[in-house]
C-alpha cells in the first residue's frame, strides 16, 4: 500500500484523512507493507516540511511494516517531525521549490519500493 498526503497549514495532515485514518489504523495490517509520501513547501514551511507523513506513520506504526524511508541528504528544510535520526519516514516532495529533483527522487524511491514489495 502507498499512502500519500499533502501537508496543509503548519505540518497538518490534510482534512480528508480525518474520517479514514482512524478506521484504517484499526484494520488488520499485520501482513501488509505500507509506504508513505507527503507533499509540502520546504521554503515557506521549512520548520514543518512534509510533517503530515508523521501523523500517518504514528497511526500505523507497530501494526504493519513501514517501508520507503529516505535519507534527508539533499533536502533543504530546518526541521520536520517527518524525520527521525536523519531519515524521512517516507518520500517528501516539494513541487514548489525543488521541482527539478522530483522525478529523480520518485524514480529512486520506486526502485527501492520494488525491492520491498516483492
Give the ranges of each region predicted by the language model.
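FMN-binding flavodoxin-like domain, especially the glycine-rich phosphate-binding loop
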Residues: 1-118
Amino acid at each position: 500500500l502507498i499512502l500519500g498526503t499533502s501537508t496543509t497549514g503548519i505540518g497538518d495532515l490534510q482534512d480528508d484523512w480525518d474520517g479514514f485514518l482512524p478506521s484504517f489504523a484499526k484494520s488488520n495490517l499485520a501482513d501488509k507493507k505500507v509506504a508513505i509520501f507527503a507533499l509540502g513547501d520546504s521554503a515557506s514551511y521549512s520548520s514543518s516540511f512534509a510533517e503530515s507523513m508523521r501523523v500517518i506513520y504514528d497511526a500505523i506504526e507497530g501494526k504493519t511494516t513501514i517501508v520507503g524511508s529516505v535519507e534527508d541528504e539533499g533536502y533543504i528544510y530546518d526541521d520536520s517531525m517527518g524525520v527521525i535520526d536523519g531519515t524521512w519516514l517516507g518520500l517528501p516532495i516539494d513541487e514548489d521549490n525543488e521541482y527539478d529533483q522530483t522525478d529523480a527522487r520518485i524514480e529512486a524511491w520506486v526502485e527501492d519500493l520494488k525491492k520491498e514489495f516483492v
